[in-house]
From Swiss-Prot:
The lineage of its organism: Bacteria, Pseudomonadati, Pseudomonadota, Gammaproteobacteria, Enterobacterales. The keyword Membrane does not apply. The active site is at Y140, K178. It comes from Yersinia pestis. Contains a large N-terminal NADP-binding domain, and a smaller C-terminal substrate-binding domain. Homopentamer. Substrate binds at N169, S180, H187, F201, A202, G203, S204, R209, Y272. This is ADP-L-glycero-D-manno-heptose-6-epimerase. NADP(+) binds at residues 10-11, 31-32, 38, 53, 75-79, 92, 144, 170, 178.
Length: 310
């Protein structure tokens, strides 16, 4: 069996889909379906069982026998960069991750988990997996950073796989439940389908991010699991592309336009990553050689999926 925490969420459900694609269906999804809309991410997937997050935490802390487990993909977390409840964030992202990590270490179960590019904070260069380059801007980034630090202390002594991925700007199918935290491509598509002009912040040609298609993220996870590689790795494309490029791809797909530019919100100033670009040196050195989709390629594939039944 494989366990995917956050399996009804965005990246988790795409990992479940990727596992299904290689014939793997003995999957336990762990999630919190308080937000009942997330169930839609699972309806076309094959899983063996579902378990509520709180029941799962109680089981692993108690050391319950959960049978033979081939791997745990730990994607479950609070991923809102605008959430400032530090206790909630640390319980959800830090303590929960430690509990699962030790459960895996005690049983030699491969443990692959979601870190984040938010660990790098507001820097504009050297997005390198090293302590000197890490300075998170918000409590979400700090919770991810602190767990990475915890993992770094344990890695040299670990007898089983521990692998963390610093996800950059992930977009693609199954993110609709994220609301305001969903990708720009998702929101622009909705605006156009509602008969509105697509809206971007003024200066969006200058805001550049490393946008990575979620299918590529799932591929990275499966490759590292199948190859047993440990460490903390950036998971981006190695290319910074502008929000304008995302809008251009959406407008091109819909043959619509023009874009309407709106003022940048005051509350985000100083807390907003203006530039991200993954350094892929470590990822490539580990042996991962697949190419990553460009924004133009990924957005086109994503919009075809989003509009498949419109």
């Amino acid at each position: 069996m494989i366990i995917v925490t956050g399996g009804a969420g965005f990246i988790g459900s795409n990992i479940v889909k990727a596992l299904n694609n290689i014939g793997y269906k003995d999957i336990l999804v762990v999630d919190n379906l308080k937000d009942g809309t997330k169930f839609v991410n699972l309806v076309d997937l094959d899983i063996a069982d579902y378990m509520d997050k709180e029941d799962f935490v109680a089981s692993i802390v108690a050391g319950d026998d959960m049978g033979d487990i081939d791997a745990i993909f730990h994607e479950g977390a609070c991923s809102s960069t605008t959430e400032w409840d530090g206790k909630y964030m640390m319980d959800n992202n830090y303590q929960y991750s430690k509990d699962i990590l030790h459960f895996c270490l005690d049983r030699s179960i491969p443990f692959l988990y979601a870190s984040s590019a938010a660990t790098y904070g507001g820097r504009t260069d050297n997005f390198i997996e090293d302590r000197q380059y890490e300075q998170p801007l918000n409590v979400y980034g700090y919770s991810k950073f602190l767990f990475d630090q915890y993992v770094r202390e344990i890695l040299p002594q670990a007898d089983s796989q521990i692998c963390g991925f610093r996800y950059f700007n992930v977009y693609g199918p199954r993110e609709g439940h994220k609301g305001s935290m969903a990708s720009v491509a998702f929101h622009l598509n909705n605006q156009i389908n509602a008969g509105e002009r697509p809206k971007l912040f003024a200066g969006s040609e200058n805001f550049k991010r490393d946008f990575i298609y979620v299918g590529d993220v799932a591929d990275v996870n499966l490759w590292f699991w199948q190859n047993g590689v440990s460490g903390i790795f950036n998971c981006g494309t190695g290319r910074a592309e502008s929000f304008q490029a995302v809008a251009d791809a959406v407008v091109d797909y819909h043959q619509s336009g023009p874009v309407e530019y709106i003022e940048f919100p005051e509350k985000l100033k100083g807390r907003y990553q203006a530039y991200t670009q993954a350094d892929l040196t470590k990822l490539r050195a580990a042996g991962y050689g697949k190419p990553f989709k460009t924004v133009a390629e990924g957005v086109k594939e994503y919009l075809a999926w989003l509009n498949r039944s419109v």
